[in-house]
Amino acid sequence: MQDFIQKELEAHILTTQETMKRLAPLVEEVASLMVDCLKSGHKILLFGNGGSAADAQHIAAELTGRYKKERRGLPAIALTTDTSALTAIGNDYGYDRVFSRQVEALAHKGDLLVGISTSGNSPNVLLALEEGRRIGCVCVGLSGREGGRMNELCDINLVIPSHDTPRIQEMHITLAHILCHLVEERAIA
């Protein structure tokens, strides 16, 4: 059992080191996009499936509540939380449209979308990003593996350099915390 624990922790450390080498400048760019969005009176919409849905909710909560610093709430909405909307849209239009229909209803030009998918290929995330691009939203991705189709649809896609879903998810929430810190410091300064 100790070997497994050691191996998992080492894999986490290696993924963290690779992520730091490859993505640090892009994380700063994403933070700037988020700050620009918020300072111009727009909002951030986040979405994903499973663990990525939980990450979307977590990030939205850090922004609307607070991360570390006492400040005004920032407009961020997780499109994963309204069970009535999710089930109605899923029933009437299919599960692939559960996020794109909400983007159509809630997003405006200048808003920022954050699509989260460890593969970069979740159909409902891709359709939401496509809808966001049509509207004129800034599109950001948190993905893994090679980034999938999200590479084409995102202004910036933060692709975690791993094929292991748990490692990708760990880096997503780490980068999310870094982004929340940077936004909190700069969006209300």
Swiss-Prot record:
Residues that, per the record, bind Zn(2+): H58, E62, Q169, H177
Pathway assignment: Carbohydrate biosynthesis; D-glycero-D-manno-heptose 7-phosphate biosynthesis; D-glycero-alpha-D-manno-heptose 7-phosphate and D-glycero-beta-D-manno-heptose 7-phosphate from sedoheptulose 7-phosphate: step 1/1
InterPro entries linked to this entry: GmhA/DiaA (IPR035461), Phosphoheptose_Isoase (IPR004515), SIS_dom (IPR001347), SIS_dom_sf (IPR046348), SIS_GmhA/DiaA_subfam (IPR050099)
Record-linked Pfam families: SIS_2 (PF13580)
Domain of life: Bacteria
Compartment(s) where it occurs, according to its Swiss-Prot or TrEMBL record: Cytoplasm
Main location: cytoplasm
Names of required cofactors: Zn(2+)
Broadest EC class assigned to this enzyme: isomerase
Recorded GO MF terms: carbohydrate derivative binding; D-sedoheptulose 7-phosphate isomerase activity; zinc ion binding
Reactions this protein catalyses: 2 D-sedoheptulose 7-phosphate = D-glycero-alpha-D-manno-heptose 7-phosphate + D-glycero-beta-D-manno-heptose 7-phosphate
Gene3D superfamilies: Glucose-6-phosphate isomerase like protein, domain 1 (3.40.50.10490)
Function statement: Catalyzes the isomerization of sedoheptulose 7-phosphate in D-glycero-D-manno-heptose 7-phosphate.
Protein family: Belongs to the SIS family. GmhA subfamily.
Summary of subunit composition and partner proteins: Homotetramer.
Name assigned to this protein: Phosphoheptose isomerase
Species annotation: Wolinella succinogenes (strain ATCC 29543 / DSM 1740 / CCUG 13145 / JCM 31913 / LMG 7466 / NCTC 11488 / FDC 602W) (Vibrio succinogenes)
